[in-house]
Amino acid sequence: MSNNAAYAVTPVKTTSTSSRTTFHFAAGLCSGLTSSILLQPADLLKTRVQQSQKTASLLPTIKTILSSPHPIRGLWRGTLPSALRTGFGSALYFTSLNALRQGLAQTEASMAIAASSSDGKSRTSSSALPKLSNWGNLATGAVARTAAGFVMMPVTVLKVRYESDYYAYRSLYSAGRDIVRTEGVRGLFSGFGATAARDAPYAGLYVLFYEQLKRRLASVASSEQSEQPLKSTSSSSINFVSGGLAAGLATAITNPFDAVKTRLQLMPGKYGNMIRAVRLMIREDGVRSLFGGLGLRITRKALSSALAWTVYEELILRAEAHWAEKDKIDL
């Protein structure tokens, strides 16, 4: 089966094979683990820059880590909680996102049919997801991310505390035990309000920008290929570029929430809640503190989102092509 044939799938999926929950979970887990492990140094540096009450500079932070006895280990400090959070968080996110999009696609059936019929038999889209309206993309992204974020919140708190040099935790177990002992179980959910306020608009905007960019880039690529079905390499390139650009835009808009979230998770006793945290940060460190780590976060988010979504969509497209071929043989 050729690559072109393998990708000749319609944008709207209504068969049972297109919503196999287990595979969406596995594909999300694989994509999340890949991006989190490769990009852990950028995430650690972002946490170190944002933790400072006097916004730290990137270069001195890097020099401090590299001058330590174990610089490589230092750059990948916190990889385990980060991989757990991002891996399983991505698995939950993509699984719930697929379920939400499949359900919402049924209510937008007329739009989906029109889009499908206009595409004909060739696939001129790089997407493995059902086509939705802009509001559909915004809503499903926001809801799926908030739900996954709540489930993974304790791991997120452990990750931030362990990456930070504000605490001297020797292991994840000691970190969790100390948090529960001193702050109670609610300490494991410190900063959830700021996290949800960051993740809901970020994820919604990301999916909106991502789908729009893919549509436009696929249209350009299709015209250059004389309306031939998109090749596998073209689809992957479109998804990667779209993922990076969408993440950069969404990250720049939502970075203040990320900065507030980091302070709340590191020093909940001092900052208390989102409103108090914003006031204290601006009063003590200036408005620039709300954009601490922006460059690092954009870099990491652009790369991680591009990697995660490209890997996820590639796995789903190949799996659905395999299932479709298997169904034909069974018939």
Swiss-Prot record:
Solcar repeats: 19-103, 132-216, 234-318
Keyword annotations of the record: Membrane, Mitochondrion, Mitochondrion inner membrane, Repeat, Transmembrane, Transmembrane helix, Transport
Superkingdom of the organism of origin: Eukaryota
Membrane topology per record: Multi-pass membrane protein
GO cellular component, one term: mitochondrial inner membrane
Transmembrane spans: 25-50, 78-104, 138-163, 191-214, 238-264, 293-311
Chief location: mitochondrion
GO molecular function: glycine transmembrane transporter activity
This protein's record includes keyword Membrane: yes
Cellular localization per UniProt: Mitochondrion inner membrane
Pfam families, per the entry: Mito_carr (PF00153)
Cross-referenced PANTHER family: MITOCHONDRIAL GLYCINE TRANSPORTER
Homology family: Belongs to the mitochondrial carrier (TC 2.A.29) family. SLC25A38 subfamily.
Its biological purpose: Mitochondrial glycine transporter that imports glycine into the mitochondrial matrix. Plays an important role in providing glycine for the first enzymatic step in heme biosynthesis, the condensation of glycine with succinyl-CoA to produce 5-aminolevulinate (ALA) in the mitochondrial matrix.
Protein's name according to its UniProt entry: Mitochondrial glycine transporter
Organism per entry: Neosartorya fischeri (strain ATCC 1020 / DSM 3700 / CBS 544.65 / FGSC A1164 / JCM 1740 / NRRL 181 / WB 181) (Aspergillus fischerianus)
Taxonomic classification: Eukaryota, Fungi, Dikarya, Ascomycota, Pezizomycotina
